[in-house]
Amino acid sequence: MQGILSIQSHVSFGHAGNSSAVFPMQRMGFEVWPIHTVQFSNHTQHQEGWTGRAFSADDISELVRGLGNIGALEKCQAVLTGYQGSAEQCLAVEDTVTKVKQANPEALYVCDPVMGAPDKGCIVAPGIAENLLNRLMPMADVIVPNQFELSQFAEMEIHTLDDAINACQRALAKGPKVVLVKHLYCLSDDSFNMLLATSEGTYLAKRPHFEFAKAPVGAGDLISAIFTAGLLKGWTPKQAFQHCHDACYGVLNATYQAGEWELQTIAAQQEFVEPSAHFPLEEVTLSQA
């Protein structure tokens, strides 16, 4: 039985981390083997707080060892990683990806390098950003950063579309074959913008921006998951990008229409297989100015 190994956070209530990523990949036809880096009652933006705990790097390694014992690593089609709770967890992920690729050289590694955002800066514990930037992102086949995380990896500021394209080229030169920028903040606030860059070209996706009273959590995890599943279906990066962009819009639209701020992942599940809206991609190049 082939599957996707998904190593990221988990919440019991709502949809963030694995709680946002696992079901969409299953709905798209894939077995998923989740390993949680933390397990919380709910996501951390609830003003009432949350309960739960982080798992150790040894907890991750122990579960991966067990998967290896039953021959699962040879059948692993992809490793998807998101939020890591400690620098040591990043090292356990690095070791896991190495083991999976030794067992199955065709396996993909998709890294969502959760670090922070422009308005918040780096929000992760000491050592995590360094290990993401210097270890996990360079070894990944695909990275799914936001604008802040891309700027950290490319070691340059991003203020314009040209900056973003240049940053993606720098990122591709460091090892990854695909860069999906899950949120490009530097463009117009009238739309929500994403960018895809490969050696074949760079594509901009725009969709309407919803004015939520409280911003939903877990949309980035959803994007990474749907994109990973799309690639494993044999789609080109451009096709997988188009699909995940449209599908994510559908889930956010359902969430907005329901007056909720927890993603309506279950109610809108048909979006994962047949998105209800379509926003054509635009191929972009560096301006001549």
UniProtKB/Swiss-Prot annotation:
PANTHER family listed in its UniProt record: PYRIDOXAL KINASE (PTHR10534:SF2)
Cofactor: Mg(2+)
Gene Ontology terms describing biological process: pyridoxal 5'-phosphate salvage
Entry annotated with the keyword Magnesium: yes
Binding site for ATP: D112, V144, E149, K182
Record function comment: Pyridoxal kinase involved in the salvage pathway of pyridoxal 5'-phosphate (PLP). Catalyzes the phosphorylation of pyridoxal to PLP.
The keyword Electron transport belongs to this UniProt entry's keyword annotation: no
Family to which the UniProt record says this protein belongs: Belongs to the pyridoxine kinase family. PdxY subfamily.
GO molecular function per UniProt: ATP binding; magnesium ion binding; pyridoxal kinase activity
Reactions catalysed according to its record: pyridoxal + ATP = pyridoxal 5'-phosphate + ADP + H(+)
InterPro entries found in the cross-reference section: PM/HMP-P_kinase-1, PyrdxlKinase, Pyridoxal_kinase_PdxY, Ribokinase-like
Name recorded for this polypeptide: Pyridoxal kinase PdxY
Oligomeric and partner information: Homodimer.
Residues where substrate binds: S9, T44, Q45, D221
Functional pathway: Cofactor metabolism; pyridoxal 5'-phosphate salvage; pyridoxal 5'-phosphate from pyridoxal: step 1/1
EC number: 2.7.1.35
Protein keywords: ATP-binding, Kinase, Magnesium, Nucleotide-binding, Transferase
A cellular component term, taken from the record's GO annotations: cytosol
Domain of life assignment: Bacteria
